[in-house]
């Protein structure tokens, strides 16, 4: 084979390789462009509509004070309502609230009747194919509640040998049973049929400490007699929900939540509505 023939063959082999690889490169380029457009919001029609129309539509079940309810004047009020209003203010748009029964919230969201759900929502792992969830803005996990004079109780290990009140069958009851079974915690479990009953037991000195969720704790702890031990023993985040085709919208929500955590806005809401 002559030198020219060899060079011609090498060029031919290179061209074959190029034609084999070029389609793959084009496919990868198109996929990357698609991701970029998605990330830049070109495919988030919800965020685009909010910006163009100047209206954020928020769905909530307005029957859960102090997070959301309708007052005597017919106005939406509460912790979550303030979140929705602050989002709208941050984005320079108006906010319209819709009162929807809790069981119908996700249907309304998927039917595009609302843009976001802000309604003391727990993170539901079974819905993540259709729903995008924000970062947590409130932890409703289980907490210890103690009389002020029991300040030595600072963690769950400190209830060893103590009388602990829980609501019968509630998550706190299950948590305490698990701790006694798996970690060998020794405590006398006293049950009540409702939250008011176990708080009465604590206030009357019949138990040393109680465990309940953080929302219930704030509802019943008033004045100086009782104290909530922070941080919570478990994590039960409240989150904001958007449709799966609204990635830019939920990203903007997450940025707002991060800013609120840094500025103390969420602490202010807890102080206003819960404490």
Predicted regions and their residues:
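Short, Asp-centered acidic motifs that coordinate Mg2+ and/or phosphate
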Residues: 56-57, 111, 115-116, 132, ...
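Hydrophobic membrane-insertion alpha-helices, especially the h-region
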Residues: 16-34
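Extracytoplasmic small-molecule ligand-binding "clamshell" domains
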Residues: 10-20, 38-120, 189-191, 253
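Bilobed "Venus flytrap"/periplasmic-binding protein-like clamshell domains
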Residues: 57-66, 74-89, 121-122, 143-197, ...
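Ligand-binding clefts/hinges and TM-proximal coupling segments of bilobed small-molecule sensing domains
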Residues: 28-42, 171-192, 224-232, 257-275
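Acidic, polar ligand-binding/catalytic clefts
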Residues: 37-40, 81, 85, 89, ...
């Amino acid at each position: 084979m002559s030198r020219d023939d060899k060079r011609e063959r090498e060029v031919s082999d290179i061209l074959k390789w190029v034609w084999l690889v070029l389609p793959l490169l084009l496919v990868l380029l198109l996929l990357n462009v698609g991701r970029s457009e998605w990330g830049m919001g070109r495919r988030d029609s919800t965020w685009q509509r909010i910006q163009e129309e100047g209206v954020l539509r928020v769905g909530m079940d307005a029957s859960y004070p102090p997070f959301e309810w309708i007052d005597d004047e017919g106005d939406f009020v509460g912790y979550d309502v303030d979140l929705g209003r602050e989002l709208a203010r941050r984005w320079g748009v108006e906010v319209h609230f819709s009162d929807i029964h809790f069981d119908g919230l996700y249907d309304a969201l998927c039917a595009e009747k609302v843009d976001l759900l802000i309604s003391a929502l727990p993170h539901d792992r079974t819905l993540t194919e259709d729903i995008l969830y924000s970062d947590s803005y409130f932890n409703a996990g289980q907490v210890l509640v103690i009389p002020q004079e029991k300040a030595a109780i600072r963690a769950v290990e400190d209830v060893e040998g103590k009388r602990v009140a829980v609501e019968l069958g509630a998550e706190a009851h299950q948590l305490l049973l698990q701790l006694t079974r798996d970690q060998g915690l020794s405590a006398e479990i006293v049950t009540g049929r409702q939250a008011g009953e176990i708080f009465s037991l604590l206030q009357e000195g019949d138990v040393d400490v109680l465990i309940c969720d953080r929302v219930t704790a704030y509802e019943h702890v008033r004045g100086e007699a009782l104290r909530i031990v922070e941080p919570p023993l478990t994590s039960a985040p409240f989150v904001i929900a958007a449709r799966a085709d609204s990635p830019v919208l939920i990203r903007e929500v997450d940025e707002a939540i991060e800013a609120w955590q840094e500025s103390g806005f969420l602490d202010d809401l807890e102080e206003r509505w819960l404490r």
